Amino acid sequence: MSERKYFGTDGVRAVAGEFPLTAGWVLNLGAAAGEVLKRRGERPSVVIGKDTRQSGDMLEAALAAGLTSRGVTVIHVGVLPTPGVSYLTRHLGADAGVVISASHNPYADNGIKFFGADGQKLTDATELAIEAAIDEVPNFAPVTGAALGSVTNYTEAERLYIQFLREHAPDLSGLKVAMDCANGAAYRVGPKVFQAAGADVFAVYTTPDGHNINRGCGSTHLEHLQRIVREGDYDLGVAFDGDADRALFVDSRGNVVHGDHMLLLNARARRDRAVVTTIMANMALEVKLREAGIPLERTAVGDRYVHERLHEQGLTLGGEQSGHVLFLDVAPTGDGVLTALLTLSAMKRLGTTLDELHDELVMFPQTLVNVRVGNKKAIARDEVVRAAVQEAEARLRGRGRVNLRPSGTENLIRVMVEGPDEAEIHEIARTLAGVVEKRGRVEV
């Protein structure tokens, strides 16, 4: 595969106003994307949505200008969660969708992520074709007159997305819910859907000003929501991130209920034949799923790897501790509001509560030791290190796990040991780190 110049694992992301997220470059990106889409058919259409960042307006205008300059019809859906844009791309039969968001990042950042007509992330081949076309924009043949594209503001977008979510909502009558909308894309959708399902909702961080998205709030800053739930008479709390593709819960006592808990609850209710998560999921989840007869498959860190494994194995349920949970039999992307609704539906079906779920899934202690080495790739292949890992795993006898992985940015090996006995895992981690450090000093 060719090396990427602009697209990362989640589209293009940077500080808005700095390269590549300048108005000029984004205009060229739109023109390049439009040209690639035109190769597949005349008059393609593209749905564009955004979160609440101030820079979204500038990027949206530049992208739309580029797309329409190549004859593309642009459908603006306004502020909407990322999965809402995915849904509307499919629902409206558009050729592609675009989300302008940087998810849980600070407001100064922004990003541009494309969806295909199926509502899923663009294929690598299509992204690479767009990248190649960016450099050719000055050489494109002019598009003029009636061949130019147009822009439509689609005012039914929020209503249609809410209608889709309500189809998957359980009866929440009598449930008192505190909700943190992160001053982000779910600030209207989240409360409306839960209220329509019958919940008594107290929503906070629903006044975006372009600068306050994710600031001390949302799924990465649960402290205020925990305090609200503890001090008020709430059954639970739920928090979304800036683009609402993930959700985390707080039980009635203020304890965090994260992705591991949600995967266990939903897998039991759905009787999935297997669940996919990453190497960061706690061993306690694996043990509980094993007791229920449900295998757990692990991938590298990142929701894209979970998504890929689900497709490869023909599975539908997977996710991460961060609250990014995939229900591929319901939607092709992670959806925070949908995740919350389906989790509460599973809770009702099994006759349990988030408090009981939190207390049942007791997380195994975990220790992480960073070891600086000369050649992190060589260490990962070293036979002495591998033998030490096997010895550590044998000592845990299936009651825990060991994971060594190189840092993505530094010459470090991260030694992680997890198990029910805290003293034992600390001792194992120290021993293993010592072997890694010693081998890291020699040519391996």
From Swiss-Prot:
Pfam families: PGM_PMM_I, PGM_PMM_II, PGM_PMM_III, PGM_PMM_IV. One of its GO terms (molecular function) is phosphoglucosamine mutase activity. It comes from the Bacteria. Binds 1 Mg(2+) ion per subunit. It catalyses: alpha-D-glucosamine 1-phosphate = D-glucosamine 6-phosphate. Activated by phosphorylation. The modification Phosphoserine is found at residue 103. Mg(2+) binds at residues 103, 241, 243, 245. The active site is at residue 103. Its EC number is 5.4.2.10. Its cofactor is Mg(2+). One of its GO terms (cellular component) is cytosol. InterPro entries: A-D-PHexomutase_a/b/a-I, A-D-PHexomutase_a/b/a-I/II/III, A-D-PHexomutase_a/b/a-II, A-D-PHexomutase_a/b/a-III, A-D-PHexomutase_C, A-D-PHexomutase_C_sf, A-D-PHexomutase_CS, Alpha-D-phosphohexomutase_SF. The keyword ATP-binding does not apply. One of its GO terms (biological process) is peptidoglycan biosynthetic process. Keywords: Isomerase, Magnesium, Metal-binding, Phosphoprotein. Catalyzes the conversion of glucosamine-6-phosphate to glucosamine-1-phosphate. NCBIfam families: glmM, PRK10887.1. Belongs to the phosphohexose mutase family. This is Phosphoglucosamine mutase.
